[in-house]
Design a protein with these regions (language model features):
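Short, conserved catalytic-motif segment at the N-terminal edge
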Residues: 2-57
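Active-site SXXK
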Residues: 12, 26, 32, 55-83, ...
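Active-site-proximal alpha-helical segments within enzyme catalytic domains
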Residues: 141-145, 205-227, 290-306
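Active-site-proximal binding-pocket segments
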Residues: 174, 179-183, 191-231, 241
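Active-site Gly/Thr loop motif
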Residues: 182-205, 243-301
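Structured C-terminal helix/loop/strand segments within mature extracytoplasmic catalytic/sensor domains
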Residues: 281-343
Length: 343
């Protein structure tokens, strides 16, 4: 094994240990081929199966990239006129005063300014488009929007139009425990469970996939919707999802987003992408540790999987996310950035 590959895997193992994850996996594709694959650990914090190619991880918020593709279809098929349509044009069941000026673009780029209290009431943190904050309420609204537009769940569209043509066998919204599912650890001393959310939350939660199929999901985007020479997803849908759709912020520290994906424009302090990763790259993350990095400049897809809720580093977790993508950049012959470009 190339020394730089081993160095990256050692780093993945180190963070796995520090964060009390029981499992880790790495799959790297370049030029449509797997060039590195690594599995270690077990499915939970009690006696359980060894991690392997069939192990299905709960990817938590990384499922946003799947919802993003569904909304990309809605735009492509003119179900939505524009990203700049106000949400109130489609959904009437929310307080119109609070939602005033909130567009689909704001919801898809985390610039909507909405949040939710423990009692379920919605309030506004800042005016739509004026800042950026990662909150969960936009996922529920966008999920509702898709169902309003198509009269069925976005998961059905993905299964029929994407998963089946790709031949996916191990990507599913799981509702029952099985030996293939990697359990999520909240606390090392507590029993782990395969689910993060209630079955009926309506947001396509508890999406499980293997490291290989997660990498193929990234590779589909890298190839602009093509898989083994066949155009599975329209190129325009992929372009919508993975190009910058966020507005310019007064605060230069805030990240750029496509449709939920973080997109590398230039190094941003509050972005999860490392400053050494080339422009045009994009990444998605879940709080159980899955990370999918796509680097078009080097025709590269990098997947890292864990099974511990909350990413290592506490309030400084972004540092470790950037550190991983920077190390991946160094390992797979992406030119390193100079000190002048570092944060």
């Amino acid at each position: 094994m190339h020394p730089s590959y081993q160095k990256l895997l050692s780093y993945v193992s180190e963070i796995k240990h520090l964060n009390h994850s029981s499992a880790a996996a790495v799959v790297v594709m370049q030029n449509d081929q797997i060039i590195l694959e690594h599995y270690e650990g077990v499915h939970g914090n009690e006696h359980s199966n060894l991690i392997g190619i069939d192990s299905m991880f709960n990817i938590a918020s990384a499922r946003k990239s799947y919802l993003a593709l569904a909304i990309g279809y809605a735009l492509y098929e003119k179900k939505i006129h524009s990203l700049d349509d106000c949400v109130s044009k489609y959904l009437k069941n929310y307080d119109q005063q609070i939602f005033q000026g909130t567009t689909i673009r704001h919801l898809m780029t985390h610039s909507h300014g909405l949040d939710e209290r423990d009692d379920g009431s919605i309030y506004r943190e800042f005016a739509a488009g004026e800042s950026w904050a990662y909150r969960g309420i936009n996922i529920r609204i966008i999920t509702e929007l898709f169902k309003y537009l198509y009269d069925y769940d976005f998961t059905q569209l993905l299964k029929e139009r994407v998963f089946m043509p790709l031949g996916f066998k191990s990507t599913e919204w799981s509702t029952e425990e099985s030996e293939a599912l990697v359990k999520v650890i909240d606390y090392p001393e507590q029993k782990a469970t395969f689910q993060l959310y209630p079955y009926d939350d309506g947001m396509g939660s508890n999406l499980h996939t293997t490291a290989r199929e997660f990498a193929l999901w990234g590779n589909l985007h890298l190839n602009m919707g093509r898989h083994e020479g066949i155009q599975v997803v329209p190129e325009d849908v992929i372009r919508l999802c993975t190009s910058i759709q966020s507005l310019q912020y007064d605060d230069g520290r805030l990240p750029a987003n496509g449709l939920f994906w973080y997109v590398q424009e230039k190094a941003k302090e509050r972005s999860e992408i490392g400053e050494c990763v080339p422009k045009g790259s994009y990444q998605i993350l879940g709080n159980t540790g899955p990370l999918l990095l796509v680097v078009p400049e080097n025709h590269l897809v990098v997947v890292r999987m864990y099974n511990k809720r909350y990413n290592y580093g506490g309030k400084n977790y972004l540092h470790y996310l950037r550190e991983f993508s920077n190390r991946a950049s160094d390992a797979f012959t992406i030119p390193s950035c100079s000190k002048m470009h570092r944060l």
